[in-house]
Amino acid sequence: MGLWDALLNWLRSLFFKQEMELSLIGLQNAGKTSLVNVVATGGYSEDMIPTVGFNMRKVTKGSVTIKLWDLGGQPRFRSMWERYCRSVSAIVYVVDAADPDNLSVSKSELHDLLSKTSLNGIPLLVLGNKIDKPGALSKEALTDEMGLKSLTDREVCCFMISCKNSTNIDQVIDWLVKHSKSSN
């Protein structure tokens, strides 16, 4: 049966290609560009240059092509977030789980963005990054601090990840493929 399933999956991949478009947003130094690099190449670098404006990268995983918009997190770029989040398959909000000092700003920026009617119903994936660092929040603490339970107009999920160690990156990709707006 395994050979038959493999053959069917191969045939499906030839005829049923899926495309997704994602916006990666979050405050500066949360790890958005590192996430793009880990998803695209499996590689991680300690030396990241802050994103100025945005970068776009296409990545293919199996039969799914993912277009990733990596948006700058500095205050001067946050006004662009809404524009790049309209009509995407999902919004990926990256939070530095080891930086409690920025959580209130991060929560405020996320909730302000999601209050825009143009973004109603777009699935949200919140990623607590840098769980490899001491003092990183738990999933429950991050969910509470970010007020995620109050977001009821869309599908919301939270994963704790480490781009540095590639922790939970495969689960993130699986969730995105299964729950993105385009696959509903």
From Swiss-Prot:
Pfam families in the cross-refs: Arf (PF00025)
Domain of life: Eukaryota
InterPro entries hit by this protein: Arl8a/8b, P-loop_NTPase, Small_GTP-bd, Small_GTPase_ARF/SAR
Binding site for GTP: 29-34, 48-51, 70-74, 129-132
GO molecular function annotations of the record: GTP binding; GTPase activity
Keywords, ordered alphabetically: Cell cycle, Cell division, Chromosome partition, Cytoplasm, Cytoskeleton, Endosome, GTP-binding, Lysosome, Membrane, Mitosis, Nucleotide-binding
PROSITE patterns xref list: ARF (PS51417)
Any one of the GO BP annotations: cell division
Chain's role: May play a role in lysosome motility. May play a role in chromosome segregation.
Family: Belongs to the small GTPase superfamily. Arf family.
Protein name (Swiss-Prot/TrEMBL): ADP-ribosylation factor-like protein 8b
Organism: Arabidopsis thaliana (Mouse-ear cress)
Phylogenetic placement of the source organism: Eukaryota, Viridiplantae, Streptophyta, Embryophyta, Tracheophyta
The encoding gene: ARL8B
